[in-house]
Amino acid sequence: MTRCRLVGASSGGKYISTTNAKTRPVMGCLRFASRLSALGSTQQPKFFALPLLATTRGFGHLVREVDMRGFRGDFGQLRHKNLASTQRYVTDALGAKKNVIFCGAYHTGKLTILKAIGEACEARGKKVAYVSCNPQRASRFGGFLLYHFVGLRYLFRNEIPSRDQLDGALERHARLCESTYAGCVPSLKSVDVLIFDAVDQLEPTILASMDAVCRRLRGKPNDAFGGLRVFAAADFWRLPVHPSSDTGGYIFQLDNWGELFPKQHLLKKIYGQTKALTTLVNKAYYGQLSAEDIEELEARSSAGRTESGAACGGSKKEASETSGSFSVSDDGSRQVEVEEEGAGSGLLPPQRLISNAEAIIKFTSRFPKQPSIRVLPPRFRTLKRTEIGNYIVNMMVQSSTLHSFGLVDSLNLDIGASVHLLFDGTADFGVTAGTVGEVLQVKEHALVVHFPSVHRTVDVPRMRISVYHPFYPEVRYEVQQFPLYPRHCISPINMLTYHHAYQVHIDCHQLADTNDLGNILARMRTFDDFTIERVHDFAHLDGMVHEPTRIYYQRIDNQPLSSAAEQWCRNCKSYVSTSDFYTHWDKCVRQVRWCTVCNTRIPLERLGPHQEKHQIVLCLDCGRAVEWRRWEGHRLTCSAMMREVSPENEFLPLRTRQLALEMGLDKRDLHTMKGFNRGMLPKSRKQCNGGEA
């Protein structure tokens, strides 16, 4: 039978391996999945703890284990599943007998609710699959990446195949899970309940294909997802949008979105955050910040920096207004009393926010001082089932990246560097996540860091996380890195990727994308965690609030659009009666688009050919940027090209001119151009100043 070696070269990257294969005894080949199933689903290998691998799912899943010899951080931190507020959502969702999606901003408890629902279904004997489109969130609740679950390649560049190709790939993978893969992973056909997180990062085409394939495979063509119970969560404020993004084509604008998720719930409470700050965060999301709100936000954030005594007093006052010292945690942070965490915050200088472009340069050091360590499985570990081996190895490699656990891939820390802790340590460690410290000493296997706010100097070892499949526990991929974040690399995109970035000075001129203001403020606990300036310059720019998300959230929450009699439709640039706005919006985004170049409405079916006319091309002869619709006229009148190809051009060799005339190569045939991005053109002063002349 064919034997397949497990090697780590497919993950792409350089590894520092600490595994010495020569010193380890050679163990036999891995067990077959069918062999384990014959022994019984509850029988576990003797050298693993029973609670670690015990499962009621009926199929294999990825196990992510933290080595106790390193930093004992909990990257999952879903500690509030049994709270009364969480269980109320669980009871309502299970009693609805419908597919449910929970929407909300960061730290509103979405992931905790999903995990609690999944465990409640497992307690009832259901087969539950945990799936997420985000690698960090998939690791936190012990699930799969969606691409591995449905059998697609991990799409780094949004390379979406056609609908027919998607349907075929999903059906083929479901059949492989039942036959070739021997039930080592769940599939759309084998599970009873699907816990689906980060729907906002999913392409609408993939969701539509999942629905169609489930209807065929499960034999229920009239039911959404073929009768599969789906509990989903999404943060549509985190859509990858920018000010010039389209107003249509989003996943919540699918024609059958209401059929796929009949019950849509909006979570508005940001846990662990003061109520006054939460009010301003929601106003920032919906674009409702007034001049008084902006003044209050800037004044209260800077008040704790001017007077250290006022900071402590204000922190205690706000602590009584928080959502509770221990509550549902969506970002995984441990909720402790605000007065304890903010006691010494006024003594620490805030770190200035840098732009995303500057952060990329600082974040990608060519020769980092603390590179990540990746321990690969020994080469003599082999799988007798080639198909299973290829699939599982690929899944483990892509699920064991540093980004999947919220760790920094390459650190470049030296003595005196400012850092903050990414995860909570154990009780004896005495330092909570987000605490800012200074590196005092750099060792080979530990960093000595002093945390002045808690008056502690501790040795921070590397955090060791291993990933393996319970059917093949001998094959493990391990990553090691210090659970620290360099403070000089704090930028908007890094604040949204790596958690617990507090004590930051937010300059709104460094914010770049839509909803950046609300997304960053949602990560703060109190006004003492940040200072902010130039809010007015960012909040009133066109496109800084994502209009489709705002309308969708107000609709499912039954919020009034406004008190005005008419509403402005951003898609067709017209005023619509408030009572008919939702009906108009649904039809408008499916029928027309607005062309900003022509300032006119374009039917949606003609949008592609119309946009092609506005494509900018660069004339390689005269160096001018020309619209494609005007290219034909330009190529006949380009002065530089006419001078070059003209038979009277004395700078061209005579033989060249004769050949050009004999072969009929005139100026039009030799004229060349290349594609050109409109964003590369020089901007006017009005655009650079944000609308001010």
From Swiss-Prot:
GO cellular component: kinetoplast; mitochondrion
Alphabetic keyword roster: DNA damage, DNA recombination, DNA repair, Kinetoplast, Mitochondrion, Transit peptide
Annotated region (Disordered), positions in chain: 300-348
The keyword DNA damage belongs to this UniProt entry's keyword annotation: yes
Localization per record: Mitochondrion matrix, Kinetoplast
Knockout consequences: Essential, it cannot be deleted.
Transmembrane segments: none
Residue stretch of the organelle transit peptide: 1-67
Any one GO BP annotation for this protein: DNA repair
InterPro entries cross-referenced by the UniProt entry: Innate_Immune_Apopt_Reg, P-loop_NTPase
Residue stretches of biased makeup (Polar residues): 321-330
Highest taxon of the lineage: Eukaryota
Chief place where the protein resides: mitochondrion
PANTHER family assigned to the protein according to its UniProt record, in alphabetical order: EXPRESSED PROTEIN, TRAF-TYPE ZINC FINGER PROTEIN-RELATED
Known function: Required for the maintenance of mitochondrial (kinetoplast) genome stability. Probably has no helicase activity, missing at least two of seven conserved helicase motifs.
Family: Belongs to the helicase family. PIF1 subfamily.
Subunit-level organization: Monomer.
Protein name, UniProt field: ATP-dependent DNA helicase-like PIF8
Gene name per UniProt: PIF8
